[in-house]
From Swiss-Prot:
Entry annotated with the keyword Transmembrane: no
Function: Cell-to-cell movement and long-distance transport of the viral infection. Also acts as a suppressor of RNA-mediated gene silencing, also known as post-transcriptional gene silencing (PTGS), a mechanism of plant viral defense that limits the accumulation of viral RNAs.
Transmembrane segments: none
Residues covered by region (Disordered): 257-304
InterPro entries for this protein: MPV
Domain of life assignment: Viruses
Basic residues bias spans: 278-295
The keyword Transport is assigned to this record: yes
Keyword annotations from UniProtKB, A to Z: Host-virus interaction, Inhibition of host innate immune response by virus, Suppressor of RNA silencing, Transport, Viral immunoevasion, Viral movement protein
Pfam families given in the database record: 3A (PF00803)
UniProt-recorded name of the protein: Movement protein
One record GO biological process: transport of virus in host, cell to cell
Comp. bias regions, Low complexity: 264-277
């Protein structure tokens, strides 16, 4: 597993002390038994703690995690029995309290449909605490090899104070097409949809992704694929639901505004020619049909 961070200085801003980094875990293979992966490697956690305490000048620095998105795709054939249980674990707690309430989902790799799992981890930890972990348990899948591939996307920010958010239950988005045929089968397309999820499913006041992260690049509208079979992620509160079409409209190339006049001028000749042809067709059609006049208009009404 690899965490892509360009610079440790990007982990915090000196002006407000808040910055969000979106990281990516690549080639996360789920095998038989239980697979656990930390959301923050120990070597990076030490550097974050040292830098945050120096920059934010606090003995206890809050490490605020945000939404976590998992992309799960099966590597076993369709019809394979068994399922997996995906849980969000807080290792700073003891026993059954390690499982974060409401952050547990199940999935069947043999269903032939990949899925996206969105976890709400708006929790606060000190920078020197043990980070959250993802636990994937194999329940009855008859294989000792890899049965699924997982890619995790998550964000966090550093702050000198704790912030409290309302946690939402975890939700799963199933894709209606096969894994190898879906539009979200490669990393770039999954990343684009995850970016859409981050931008539209956050609650008011939550930290947003910063442009310094390489995962926060939104492609041009010509490069954005059509997401088939995916329900748009829900938004909390009374906000209006956002659709992928609305998301695409936000990133229309600005050059389209400058080219609007030239497009109108180039199409004026063709439009006028079409209108002339249409008028000629209507005139020819009406010319062949005899005109029926109203009796009152011709004066044929008899007088009494």
């Amino acid at each position: 597993m690899a965490v892509h961070v360009d610079n440790v200085k990007d982990l915090a801003k000196t002006n407000e002390g808040v910055s969000v980094i979106l990281n990516r875990y690549t080639d996360w293979k789920c095998k038989s038994g239980v697979t656990e992966a930390p959301l923050l490697p120990s070597n990076l956690g030490t550097r974050i703690t040292d830098y945050a305490k120096t920059t934010l000048k606090g003995d206890s620095v809050a490490l605020n995690f945000s939404d976590l998105v998992l992309s799960l795709g099966a590597t076993v054939s369709v019809g394979t029995p068994g399922s997996v249980l995906v849980e969000l674990i807080n290792p700073n707690m003891d026993g059954p309290f390690q499982l974060v309430q409401g952050q547990s989902l199940s999935w069947s790799p043999g269903s032939g449909r990949p899925c996206l799992m969105i976890f709400s981890i708006h929790h606060q930890l000190t920078a020197d605490a043990e980070p959250f972990r993802i636990r994937i348990s194999n329940n009855g899948i008859p294989t000792k090899k890899t049965f699924a591939r997982c890619h995790a996307y998550w964000g966090f920010d550093l702050s000198p104070r704790m912030r409290y958010y309302k946690n939402e239950p975890a939700k799963r988005i199933d894709l209606d097409v096969g894994f190898y045929k879906t539009h979200l089968s490669n990393m770039k397309q999954v990343r684009d949809y995850v970016q859409y999820t981050f931008d539209n499913s956050r609650m008011d006041g939550n930290p947003q992704l910063v442009a310094k992260s390489t995962m926060n690049v939104v492609p041009r509208i010509a490069d954005v694929p059509k997401y088939v079979g995916i329900a748009p992620p829900s938004r909390s509160g009374n906000h209006q639901e956002a659709t992928p079409d609305d998301w695409l409209k936000q990133y229309v190339d600005k050059d389209s505004e400058t080219n609007k006049l030239s497009d109108v001028e180039s199409s004026s000749d063709s439009s006028s020619l079409l209108s002339m042809r249409a008028r000629s067709r209507r005139y020819t059609k009406n010319y062949k049909i005899p005109i029926k006049r109203h009796p009152q208009a011709t004066g044929e009404v008899g007088t009494t």
